[in-house]
Curated annotation (Swiss-Prot):
Protein name: Catabolite control protein A
GO terms, molecular function: DNA-binding transcription factor activity; transcription cis-regulatory region binding
Entries under CDD domains matching the protein: HTH_LacI
Chain coiled-coil ranges: none
Organism: Staphylococcus aureus (strain N315)
Amino acid sequence: MTVTIYDVAREARVSMATVSRVVNGNQNVKAETKNKVNEVIKRLNYRPNAVARGLASKKTTTVGVIIPDISNIYYSQLARGLEDIATMYKYHSIISNSDNDPEKEKEIFNNLLSKQVDGIIFLGGTITEEMKELINQSSVPVVVSGTNGKDAHIASVNIDFTEAAKEITGELIEKGAKSFALVGGEHSKKAQEDVLEGLTEVLNKNGLQLGDTLNCSGAESYKEGVKAFAKMKGNLPDAILCISDEEAIGIMHSAMDAGIKVPEELQIISFNNTRLVEMVRPQLSSVIQPLYDIGAVGMRLLTKYMNDEKIEEPNVVLPHRIEYRGTTK
């Protein structure tokens, strides 16, 4: 049987308001009374309901986390950083999987608000215009972390995809690449646009043109990478930039199955740098996003908003670096 605040109050022979003050750390309670209430709480194994506590403190110490695909290793690495900081600041998280579905995402967002969470954080994916409106109207702070879609009005944490693309393109041109393709998906549309901006800028400066820009129909998966290679097979570029590691590995394996040498005949680089990049042979060259830090800094930024701390910069850009491994020359 569930123990309630009423049971604790009755056993300790105090009012429910007194129990609530003890639970919420209110100092306006005599030490003797506080000790008696805490003894009863321990003996009855009472677990205060977060929402019930929130009625007194106006805080539930819970945050809502919206993830596009919880099974994707990219998002799990973001979530790890977030969880560690949430625990450090004594917040509990309610993690919800949106399945990359904008309608489900809206439903989850409103459901989290109804649960009286203190804040909401988006991990990865793309923020739609409709979602931006909901965020701007939200009654609680919202942070987007590792999420595609720059918006000066929404607090965010990410890397600069455009600058990363410029660096990569310049390096690959120096290594002899003259033709390029870009592979991404609908769920990373904004990141793809940012990469495309940097890629085309450097190509134009060098008098080169972009070949294929392929949008995968679904999530950025291994299978979609295989499909992308099949579309390009008759007219392969010298280098392919992939938004996700899984797409890049799908392309690499397809190329090798077709007898194409990587990186001698085809160079491949990705923008995720999940653990997968070192599990394949040759190891995958990639932009190193500090995934753990993106999740951790996003959560810390949210705690600042929730606790009315001073915000130095609402749009945090973390440094990236590029690791050239076995899929580039």
